[in-house]
């Protein structure tokens, strides 16, 4: 059991509930998870064709979230194209030039909550990177910073909603993961 990635979370939670004698609590959580997954899926059901592109950066600068990472799994449900998925690694290192050449529609940075730096400060650091002023995501004000704890594990339904709202703000308006 890892209770880590969204695509295996429901199974892992049910198994954990069985192991601990907490089947009812596990089932309540699975209903909660599926409620949010189904809501996002229904809001995005009419989206076809090309998907919005996203560069998703992990905790370190230019450490992308690639193929089969937690974000990549959520991206499939949220109908976005993870630009780093084609690089063949889960967490590939990329360069500023690569990000600029890919010109993502959305930038999402996962960050940890630390008292010395706010999420707004992390966002400002991204906005002021050399050359990033040319990116569509920056020009269109579609740069987001998200607590990384919302991408993996039991909190990931909230991360799914945030990601879907970042990729498809019109279709997901009115949905709040709070």
Predicted regions and their residues:
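Acidic/His-rich segments in extracytoplasmic proteins that coordinate ligands and/or metal ions
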Residues: 1-19, 85, 92-134
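Extracytoplasmic substrate-binding proteins
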Residues: 1-63, 84-86, 141-178
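Active-site phosphate/pyrophosphate- and oxyanion-stabilizing loops and adjacent acidic/basic residues
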Residues: 14, 72-73, 97, 161
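Short, conserved, surface-exposed binding loops centered on an aromatic residue
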Residues: 45-48, 64, 74-76, 97-102
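Conserved N-terminal glycine/acidic-rich loop preference
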Residues: 57, 72-77, 92-93, 117-128, ...
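Alpha-helical, coiled-coil/dimerization segments enriched in small aliphatic residues
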Residues: 64-91
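Short, well-ordered secondary-structure micro-motifs
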Residues: 66-68, 118-121, 156
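A short helix->loop->beta-strand "cap" motif at the edges of active sites that frequently abuts
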Residues: 135, 139-141
């Amino acid at each position: 059991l890892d209770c880590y990635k969204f695509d295996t979370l429901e199974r892992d939670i049910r198994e954990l509930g069985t192991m601990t004698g907490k089947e009812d609590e596990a089932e309540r959580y699975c209903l909660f998870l599926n409620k949010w997954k189904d809501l996002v899926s229904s809001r995005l059901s009419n989206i076809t064709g090309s998907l919005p592109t996203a560069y998703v950066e992990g905790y370190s600068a230019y450490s992308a979230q690639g193929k089969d990472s937690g974000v990549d799994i959520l991206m499939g449900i949220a109908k976005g194209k993870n630009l780093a998925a084609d690089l063949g690694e889960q967490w590939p290192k990329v360069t500023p030039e690569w990000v600029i050449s890919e010109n993502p529609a959305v930038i999402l940075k996962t960050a940890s909550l630390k008292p010395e730096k706010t999420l707004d400060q992390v966002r400002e650091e991204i906005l002021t990177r050399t050359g990033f002023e040319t990116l569509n995501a920056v020009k269109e004000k579609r740069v987001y910073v998200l607590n990384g704890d919302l991408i993996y594990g039991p909190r990931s339904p909230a991360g799914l909603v945030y990601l879907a709202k970042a990729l498809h703000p019109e279709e997901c308006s009115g949905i709040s993961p709070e």
